[in-house]
Amino acid sequence: SGNSLNSYPAPAQPVYPAANTVVKNQNPDISISLAREPAFDPKQVEMRVSGFGLVNAQYDPKEKILKWTPSRPLRLSPVTVQVRWKNLAANLWQTATWQFGIAEQEMHFIPQNVVK
């Protein structure tokens, strides 16, 4: 089914949330470490997140980590993340893709007719 978490093998790069895990937080920091990658252009690093498309992820050149925090809760599970970066030596784009799940949230309804 489209909801299975094992559509993609875990990428070689360290990612968070970890590939094919389920998190409770609906606004998790989403990140990838590119510390082990050969030379790449930090201006040519992109992150796409399902339901959001291309996102404004921040790259930390010291830690070599690309990170993004969702501006609104992630509601569709699983979440697919795709990161692309330009390998300068090979002059090729490289891609890491992974998925993680969001645990079903308990909905807290406040009835409209309650007099406060």
Feature names for model-found ranges:
Residues 17-19, 47, 59:
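Hydrophobic/anchoring residues in structured secondary elements
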Residues 54-58:
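Short, surface-exposed loop motifs enriched in S/T, G, D/E and P with embedded aromatic residues
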